[in-house]
């Protein structure tokens, strides 16, 4: 058998881009995209449009070459969905950028990525133009205006001098007979994503065609995605490419419901109007939906995948009483999205709701296509006991792990170590049943008098208080103890403005549920906690505030 070697017929590079060809054949007349502006496309039309954009990108007028970076600054609109396919189909590397970044941060990313072309949403024109003004002339990318909400797709006189064309104009240059450019190897870079920067400066994460394929197929299998679901885009497409569901929805012929607005009234309205079956949502979005004053149980259940910050069991429990069936995953930008999920066991169905929610708040086990997950002592590299108590750093190994950080070999070597593991920087435990539970970011662990305190554990208790809307716990420097827990809290209010609670009452609430050393010494009330656009609470800002407190 040793003479049987790989052959071109059995070693075609893995890529998700072929999902679109198949969708056009199998689901051609089925709706692919719905938009709140009444835009409706079929999978045949989406296939045609993506090929035309890819063709135009490679034309002499735009001149994008294989391996060059093309950026997208926009919300969850149809054109942004199409670009997830069209850009890599042209042989270019797709770079989605958070549209809520300021001009300085945006210019840093554009310069670092050496982006040659940027597709810009109308709401981001001013910030992108300011960002480009900070760049040297030879660094400046061409700009194309996304025109999802415009009728004729023509450039206005005011935009004509800054933009090369509109999205519709670029499409009209393209050829739907274009043979899209397949990767030469499955290790070829496909995606450049920047980390959200909740703890430090963003890093450029490079993901291969193989990584995206492995992530997407595993996600579909793990979530038991059916054919032709209706998927609501509440998760930003710029956030790890919507955890791979940008391509996964094509594989199953889903209807993608796009929306600019992600607020409770809009989400409930779209769920009802379009009979939504699936959506992804950060814990912040679940919290928002469960606290909406006009909330009422859903007519039909909606499958929700949540990931990001560890979701408190109380939020999961409240969401499920409304008809949201919550699944829970864990991953990072560096893994392309969730690679661990809380695989449900039938015997858990008979437990009481709070116990089910507690189990579901754990991150779980590796997804089907991922290789290994462990918790190890970062100093020795040895596995910790699987007892639900012994804490270590979460380490990962599998096909969807990044190629590395762009232009950052030192940063890459620091997390992709010689022992063959990717070190996540997250702290967790593994329970006796083999299920992972994330306890904290390593930077979020509070060391009080030599004892390690999981901020997530304290936050979980705070979220069980009926008047607490949001909670985050950080370290506050202390001369005697080194660090003590400091809680930042926002509160719920009823129609009469009731819901006020004192710092003492919050601390007393915690004292009955936590060891004394874990009880917050300080509680700060805020109207709303600072968050990234993907819903993660910006603890580095809260840590700075805590340092200045008396």
UniProtKB/Swiss-Prot annotation:
GO terms for biological process: fatty acid metabolic process. One of its GO terms (molecular function) is ligase activity. Its EC number is 6.2.1.-. The keyword Lipid metabolism applies. SUPFAM superfamilies: Acetyl-CoA synthetase-like. Keywords: Fatty acid metabolism, Ligase, Lipid metabolism. The keyword Transport does not apply. PANTHER family: ACYL-ACTIVATING ENZYME (PTHR43859), ACYL-ACTIVATING ENZYME 10-RELATED (PTHR43859:SF28). Belongs to the ATP-dependent AMP-binding enzyme family. This is Probable acyl-activating enzyme 9. The lineage of its organism: Eukaryota, Viridiplantae, Streptophyta, Embryophyta, Tracheophyta.
